[in-house]
């Protein structure tokens, strides 16, 4: 009988943990959704840049955001302590990582930015550039200052 109780207890714990995992609601967003809360980018990025948190806590690991800048916009040279996985949703964006050739992103294209890699970008004239970015660690952005910029 003791073995039977162990099996039942284990099954109950498994089912309860499955229910707990499913308690977080699924979600889907377009960058045009009115319910998104857009906030400012770090101060070193010119006015016009906005970020909307889609999922997670920016102070913790595994946060997803939309990053939006208007057309004809320069994103200054910077780096992150976290790696970032990106998909361009709108616009045309040229991204240049230090020591590598520039990559011209079109909607639907994926890009990976390693942690600590310095990079800058230019959104082409026309549509705003909207990037979906999945950060592995807490979100930050450090400007590259001085002659190395």
What are these regions (language model features)?
Residues 70-73, 80-98:
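Glycine- and acidic-residue-biased ligand/ion/polar-headgroup-sensing regions
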Residues 17-19:
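N-terminal signal peptide c-region/cleavage motif recognized by signal peptidases
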Residues 63-80, 114-115:
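Conserved short histidine dyad/triad with adjacent acidic residue
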Residues 1-9:
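Bacterial N-terminal signal peptides that target proteins for export
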Residues 99-116:
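Short acidic-glycine-tyrosine-enriched beta hairpin
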């Amino acid at each position: 009988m003791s073995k039977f109780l162990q099996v039942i207890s284990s099954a109950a714990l498994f089912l309860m943990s499955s229910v707990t995992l499913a308690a977080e609601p699924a979600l889907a967003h377009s960058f045009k959704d009115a319910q998104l809360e857009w906030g400012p980018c770090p101060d070193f990025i010119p006015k016009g840049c906005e970020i909307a948190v889609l999922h997670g806590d920016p102070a913790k690991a595994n946060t997803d955001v939309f990053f939006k800048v208007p057309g004809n916009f320069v994103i200054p040279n910077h780096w992150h302590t976290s790696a970032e996985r990106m998909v361009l949703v709108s616009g045309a964006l040229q991204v240049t990582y230090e020591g590598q050739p520039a990559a011209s992103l079109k909607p639907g294209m994926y890009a990976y930015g390693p942690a600590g890699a310095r990079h800058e970008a230019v959104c082409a004239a026309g549509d705003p550039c909207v990037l979906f970015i999945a950060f592995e660690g807490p979100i930050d952005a450090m400007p590259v200052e001085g002659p190395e910029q």
